[in-house]
Amino acid sequence: MATVIAADATSGEGFEDLAWLFSCDSRNRGLIRQGFDEAALLWKAVKATSGKVLEIGRNFGGSTVLLAAAAPDREIYSIDNRSHENSACKNYLTRSENRQRVQLLVTDSRKALPDLGFGFLFIDGDHSFEGVLADVVAHWNCLQADAGNLALAAFHDAVPNDNFKWRDTDRRFHRVLTRLKNKFRTRQKPEIAPDYSPGVWRVCEELVRRGAASKWQSAGSMLVLKKLTDLPRDFARLTAESTLTAKLDNK
């Protein structure tokens, strides 16, 4: 997918802007569970902001390491519903220079962290529509532009991409087998696994449509939005109703 670049995107180019020189797909995800181009965009977005950083969903902790490295003098708050960090990532995050500023929280991401504001928000937790919507409602209004910099929110698995194209192109037998099995299933499975989460995409689209955000940049499945305003009071209801209407229209 082509990268979306907003008018106020960072003009100076760094190594993170040269991800197009590399083969970037699901084969190079590693501990961070992101493509190289996605991780490069995450790094760039963090650098375009200031203030505290909030991460929803850290899994092995690879993305938390990237956030800590990209924002060496900033506080990082990472929320997950379990502690599942890779040992190498955990060792990095508990170094003396990181221990006091990186908070590895095990708590409910659908509840706001009291009395905290953030310059950057990264959401990669519950990918269901309901989960992403709840995370956005809980934390969006705590996202604030700081020191003249942008307030940005990054969403992983948010837009269609080619991350799994290499794998699915030659899986003809798998697709035929899935097609046959679907004849006997009450709930159909896709012949080609989705390369993004429709629930994440829907919430991001609603943020833009309701005027709360504009699209900043994207790479692979990663979408970065620029915050424009706080959420309308009834954003959750309006978004849920809009999604239900879209489903009914597609039947």
Cite the ranges covered by each PLM segment.
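N-terminal auxiliary segments of SAM/dcSAM-dependent transferases
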Residues: 1-6
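S-adenosylmethionine/decaboxylated-SAM
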Residues: 8, 12-251
